[in-house]
Amino acid sequence: MAQPGPAPQPDVSLQQRVAELEKINAEFLRAQQQLEQEFNQKRAKFKELYLAKEEDLKRQNAVLQAAQDDLGHLRTQLWEAQAEMENIKAIATVSENTKQEAIDEVKRQWREEVASLQAVMKETVRDYEHQFHLRLEQERAQWAQYRESADREIADLRRRLSEGQEEENLENEMKKAQEDAEKLRSVVMPMEKEIAALKDKLTEAEDKIKELEASKVKELNHYLEAEKSCRTDLEMYVAVLNTQKSVLQEDAEKLRKELHEVCHLLEQERQQHNQLKHTWQKANDQFLESQRLLMRDMQRMEIVLTSEQLRQVEELKKKDQEEDEQQRINKGKDNKKIDTEEEVKIPVVCALTQEESSTPLSNEEEHLDSTHGSVHSLDADLLLPSGDPFSKSDNDMFKEGLRRAQSTDSLGTSSSLQSKALGYNYKAKSAGNLDESDFGPLVGADSVSENFDTVSLGSLQMPSGFMLTKDQERAIKAMTPEQEETASLLSSVTQGMESAYVSPSGYRLVSETEWNLLQKEVHNAGNKLGRRCDMCSNYEKQLQGIQIQEAETRDQVKKLQLMLRQANDQLEKTMKEKQELEDFLRQSAEDSSHQISALVLRAQASEVLLEELQQSFSQAKRDVQEQMAVLMQSREQVSEELVRLQKDNDSLQGKHSLHVSLQLAEDFILPDTVQVLRELVLKYRENIVHVRTAADHMEEKLKAEILFLKEQIQAEQCLKENLEETLQLEIENCKEEIASISSLKAELERIKVEKGQLESTLREKSQQLESLQEIKVNLEEQLKKETAAKATVEQLMFEEKNKAQRLQTELDVSEQVQRDFVKLSQTLQVQLERIRQADSLERIRAILNDTKLTDINQLPET
């Protein structure tokens, strides 16, 4: 009972402690709120300052970027101006060099011509003086002789007088002497007058010589001026001649290439001749093999057929013969009309010789003879089958159909025409699946179905003296798939016949379906045998293509002749372009003067831009210095604000210690009960946890803010350093550019001085260019050379025409070879048909002996 008394004391102390803690907490919260408000205010100020600084930096960067763009633009303009100046310098140097060379050349030619003219004038004056001196000497000699004769007469008279003649005679002699003196005086006076007149004439002649010399000099000067004026025309004329010469040379090269191609075509044509011979050989072998297979199949079918079937075959044969006779009569009338209108057309083979080596015609003839010999040798390698003889009318109809087939453009005919015209009904089953390319051109030209007599099929044998080649024996011995099918069919039929009983006469050994199938296959084989030969049609197309190429070459020759005429017309039209060329030269001079004035204006504009660039650079420098001052001031403000924040933090720590001391000094009433104390303690603990979390959060927040401010200060410091470096670089670059601009300005002034000098020299050169047209003689020589070149080109064209004529003759020879080849093929077809129609081996031997030919001209006309 004594223990519950003192229990309320700890509760009161706890309550007091709790109250103190609540007060401390309230004070701490108030201080925290105040600090947050102050921090937010300061943060807003810092944000405003930061945004203001960012805007200032953006403006400064924009100004710097604009200044850099202006600098780049000005640099590009300066580079362009420098490039243009370099181009102008190069053009001026080139023009000066060319003008100086032209002036030197013209001076040299002028000096040569003046020296030649002076020499000519001196020679003419010397000739005139020499002639006059000769005349004067001759006249003086004549007068001296006359005076000597007169003096001799006077001396004789005086001697006579001195000899003491009689006085009478003396008077007479004196009279005679006076008369002679008068006569002499009458002769001498006109002679003196004539001498004076001759002297006057001599002076006049000398004056005329001087006048003629002066007039000749004037004429020569006028001639030189005219030559100067004609220089541009002659230059253009020579340029046109050079272009025409190049065009003619290109045409000649094209002709050479075309001739080379044509020669290549000739070589290909020769190769095709050899290939065609082998093709005919193979076609004959294939044709013989197909004929042999037809004979064997017909013999086997004869064994299979019954007497009833043979009778039906005979009836069908008679009907077909009657129809064929009627059609033959009708077609004979039509063919007579057609033969009068149409002629045999054989495509011309275009074969041209090589350009470099002109092969003689004798070599071609030898080649053709060898070709003929190789074609004739085909007769010795042919193995011809023998069949039942045709009637005489069938043989004539075959020749008529063959002649009509030759009148067309191809060597083959349709199977329906010849099968109806010749009256062949039976087809071999073994050839039912063969293509038309397996028979060659002979089958195409002789595509007819065989009409063998069923009685004599088994009695045919090969002639004893007719030998086969190895290829023919191999082709005969080898079995084709069609032969194997036929053999299997016959073996099945013969086995059926052996196993079955012997049927009475009149009954079939095969069924109706097999019989119909056999007739269809025989009909198909005959149709395929009569198809057109693809090889012949391809060969005909090749011949037509070669003929077209020949026509094209002729057209090209005509075009070249037309081009020559046009070139001559163009040569005549060149003199009409004189005024246009003068206008062009005048316009080019005006354009050059305009370009020079435009360059002067651009140089002045570049100077103005340089001054503007200097002003903008000085303005940018002042702006950068002002920005640097503003940045320094803002840095000082930030440092002052940091010092103030440190002081505030110190003051806050002092207030915290003051509040703690105040809470300790206050009275704290503890709670009365343990339950209340426990609740109060729990409440305080929760408040302490909240306060600690808030303090930690505030501490972290303040640390983050401090770090942010430090990083911001460092970034501003780095930005400031970078800005200082960039500005320093820009200042150095601007200094360099100013130095380069000053050097460019000096260069521009020097170029202006050079421009003035060039203008003065240009005026001098323009004055001197008026004397550059004194080279007509050289141009005339060039014209003569061009005319000589034209003559050589015409000679070359004449040679090309001769080559074309020679190639035409060779083309005719090759065409004749083709005709002979076709004639030989037709003869072979006729011989094959005769052998096919032969009724005995003796007849076949006689036909083979008759075919021994030594020349193509011995072939009969078909």
Swiss-Prot record:
InterPro entries: Rabaptin, Rabaptin_coiled-coil, Rabaptin_Rab5-bd_dom. GO terms for cellular component: early endosome; endocytic vesicle; endosome; glutamatergic synapse; presynaptic cytosol; protein-containing complex; recycling endosome. Its main location: cytoplasm. One of its GO terms (molecular function) is protein homodimerization activity. The modification N-acetylalanine is found at residue 2. It is found in: Cytoplasm; Early endosome; Recycling endosome; Cytoplasmic vesicle. Proteolytic cleavage by caspases in apoptotic cells causes loss of endosome fusion activity. The modification Phosphothreonine is found at residue 408. Residues 11-328, 534-816 form a coiled coil. The modification Phosphoserine is found at residues 374, 377, 407, 410. The modification N6-acetyllysine is found at residue 282. GO terms for biological process: apoptotic process; endocytosis; Golgi to plasma membrane transport; protein localization to ciliary membrane; protein transport; regulation of postsynaptic neurotransmitter receptor internalization; vesicle-mediated transport. Keywords: Acetylation, Apoptosis, Coiled coil, Cytoplasm, Cytoplasmic vesicle, Endocytosis, Endosome, Phosphoprotein, Protein transport, Transport. Residues 315-340, 355-374 are annotated as: Disordered. Heterodimer with RABGEF1. The heterodimer binds RAB4A and RAB5A that have been activated by GTP-binding. Interacts with TSC2. Interacts with GGA1 (via GAE domain), GGA2 (via GAE domain) and GGA3 (via GAE domain). Interacts with AP1G1 (via GAE domain). Interacts with AP1G2 (via GAE domain). Interacts with ECPAS. Interacts with KCNH1. Interacts with PKD1 (via C-terminal domain) and GGA1; the interactions recruit PKD1:PKD2 complex to GGA1 and ARL3 at trans-Golgi network. Interacts with KCNH1. Belongs to the rabaptin family. Rab effector protein acting as linker between gamma-adaptin, RAB4A and RAB5A. Involved in endocytic membrane fusion and membrane trafficking of recycling endosomes. Involved in KCNH1 channels trafficking to and from the cell membrane. Stimulates RABGEF1 mediated nucleotide exchange on RAB5A. Mediates the traffic of PKD1:PKD2 complex from the endoplasmic reticulum through the Golgi to the cilium. PANTHER family: RAB GTPASE-BINDING EFFECTOR PROTEIN (PTHR31179), RAB GTPASE-BINDING EFFECTOR PROTEIN 1 (PTHR31179:SF5). This is Rab GTPase-binding effector protein 1.
